[in-house]
């Protein structure tokens, strides 16, 4: 079993598979290309393209830690752990945070909440995400389908009861 992202449909890109062609009879061209790329990665045993570090990605990674440090102690940072679907080996994800539950009476435990922290580089995007999320889940799904489907995918992979988007933008003073 592999421990890396290549050769899998990842939670962060799973939204591509929700797109249909104009006739709504098949996957969109973009989805078909994604499926082909994952197939190539499986054949090659490596990623097709080298992952590039961009300024917005570096910002998000840096600020995500700050956001985590502001959250209650129940949250566990798990973003370095890649999870795989138990039946679909080509489906994986790496959620940012989880909150576990333990029911001592019934002797069961699991994941209550799975969370993804979004720290947009742009304040405009930050405000757009907050506005959409405050409006409704459907508005967030419509405006930010990649974020929405990433949460859904990670909820399935973890078995979490709830999925939570945490949108964070530091103050200038921070």
Feature annotation, model-predicted:
Residues 48-81, 85-86, 147-148:
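Nucleic-acid endo/exonuclease domains
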Residues 1-62, 70, 132-141:
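Charged, glycine-rich intrinsically disordered N-terminal tails and low-complexity linkers that flank
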């Amino acid at each position: 079993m592999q421990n890396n992202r290549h050769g899998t449909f990842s939670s962060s890109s799973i939204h591509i598979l929700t797109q249909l062609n104009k006739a709504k009879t098949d996957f969109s061209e973009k989805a078909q290309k994604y499926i082909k790329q994952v197939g190539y990665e499986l054949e090659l045993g490596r990623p097709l393209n080298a992952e590039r570090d961009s300024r917005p990605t570096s910002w998000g990674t840096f600020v995500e830690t700050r956001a985590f440090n502001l959250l209650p102690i129940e949250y566990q940072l798990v973003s370095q752990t890649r999870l795989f679907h138990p039946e679909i080996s080509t489906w994986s994800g790496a959620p940012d945070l989880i909150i576990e539950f333990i029911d001592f009476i019934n002797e069961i435990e699991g994941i209550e909440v799975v969370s993804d922290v979004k720290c947009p580089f742009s304040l405009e995007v930050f405000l757009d995400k907050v506005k959409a999320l405050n409006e409704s889940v459907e508005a967030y799904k419509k405006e930010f389908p990649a974020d929405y489907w990433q949460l859904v995918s990670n909820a399935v992979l973890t078995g979490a009861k709830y999925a939570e988007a945490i949108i964070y933008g530091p103050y200038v003073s921070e």
